[in-house]
């Protein structure tokens, strides 16, 4: 069963200033908690386009949203295809778009998905199980230099070189096939003193591999830049992130579009092409409430950023 507790459910949707007859896009359908909360605010003219690259999530969501099926279009795709998805549906602009990034609880909790460093399973980590590249290929086939790069860039792991070297040495003899095998190899690459602080020693490397397998950061960047162009004036975009890399990227993109192009000196009035595309609704990200934290420990690292489209 695909059971997932949605983080910052009310805040994410309420910040969209939902119009009863609006058209909205859920870029990360997951357990459909946000979708259900939104649909309950729409009248019969409102509609939701629900995107997920995990077929299991979509099948579960159809059950969760069974009272609203005539108001939902389910799309099995990566959210970086948002332009194509809206074009295919003959939709130009929508009233709001939202993202709940990161891994859903069921993906972490089902050992066979190969995301968890607590449970043993074959290395996988694919959010879209129809894609070819999995964690197994990354760990066993990617060269040392690429492993160092992703561990450092996506995991902010300071022992990236040592861990990549241990992986390289281990796989010379036999493939690293399971999550707990990989955990043991990672531990060997981290000095004993460092292993005792900063949470689970494999956390950062697992995050890095997951991001690489699913091309998460580039996919999000592509998607958010498209989303900004597909939301109507005064429509909003809500984004929940779960680690500093995603949050930083979201902040940078919003800032870039808020600044607008450099205005030439001496103009008596500023032409529209030099005005900002959007404004950030919250300068500082919104954090999870105590209520959220009590329900879901993952909410501790969650941050919500919201932007409103101006033109």
From Swiss-Prot:
It is found in: Cytoplasm. One of its GO terms (biological process) is rRNA base methylation. Its main location: cytoplasm. GO terms for cellular component: cytoplasm. Keywords: Cytoplasm, Methyltransferase, rRNA processing, S-adenosyl-L-methionine, Transferase. S-adenosyl-L-methionine binds at residues 32-34, 52, 79, 100, 107. SUPFAM superfamilies: Putative methyltransferase TM0872, insert domain, S-adenosyl-L-methionine-dependent methyltransferases. Its EC number is 2.1.1.199. GO terms for molecular function: rRNA (cytosine-N4-)-methyltransferase activity. It comes from the Bacteria. The keyword Signal does not apply. It catalyses: cytidine(1402) in 16S rRNA + S-adenosyl-L-methionine = N(4)-methylcytidine(1402) in 16S rRNA + S-adenosyl-L-homocysteine + H(+). Pfam families: Methyltransf_5. It is an enzyme of class 2 (transferase). Belongs to the methyltransferase superfamily. RsmH family. Specifically methylates the N4 position of cytidine in position 1402 (C1402) of 16S rRNA. This is Ribosomal RNA small subunit methyltransferase H. It comes from Staphylococcus carnosus (strain TM300).
């Amino acid at each position: 069963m695909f059971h997932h507790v949605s983080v910052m459910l009310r805040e994410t949707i309420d910040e969209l200033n939902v119009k009863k007859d609006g058209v909205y896009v859920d870029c990360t359908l997951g357990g459909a908690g946000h979708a259900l909360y939104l649909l309950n605010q729409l009248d019969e003219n409102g509609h939701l386009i629900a995107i997920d690259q995990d077929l299991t999530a979509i099948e579960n969501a159809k059950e969760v949203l069974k009272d609203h099926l005539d108001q939902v279009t389910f799309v099995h795709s990566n959210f970086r295809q948002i332009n194509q998805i809206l074009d295919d549906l003959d939709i130009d602009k929508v009233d709001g778009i939202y993202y709940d990034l990161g891994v859903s609880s069921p993906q972490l909790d089902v050992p066979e998905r190969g995301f968890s460093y607590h449970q043993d399973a074959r290395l996988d980590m694919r959010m879209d199980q129809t894609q070819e590249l999995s964690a197994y290929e990354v760990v066993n086939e990617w060269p040392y230099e690429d492993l160092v790069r992703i561990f450092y860039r996506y995991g902010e792991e300071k022992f990236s070189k040592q861990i990549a070297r241990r992986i390289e040495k281990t796989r010379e003899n036999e493939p690293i096939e399971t999550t707990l095998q990989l955990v043991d190899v990672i531990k060997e690459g981290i000095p004993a003193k460092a292993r005792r602080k900063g949470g689970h020693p494999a956390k950062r490397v697992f995050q890095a591999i997951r991001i690489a397998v699913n091309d998460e950061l580039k996919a999000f960047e592509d998607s958010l830049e498209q989303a900004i162009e597909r939301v109507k004036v005064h429509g909003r975009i809500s984004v929940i992130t779960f680690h500093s890399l995603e949050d930083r990227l979201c902040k940078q993109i919003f800032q870039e579009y808020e600044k607008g192009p450099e205005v030439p000196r001496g103009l008596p009035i500023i032409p529209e092409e030099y005005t900002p595309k959007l404004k950030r609704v919250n300068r500082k990200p919104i954090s999870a409430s105590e209520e959220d934290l009590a329900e879901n420990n993952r909410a501790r690292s969650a941050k919500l950023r919201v932007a409103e489209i101006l033109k």
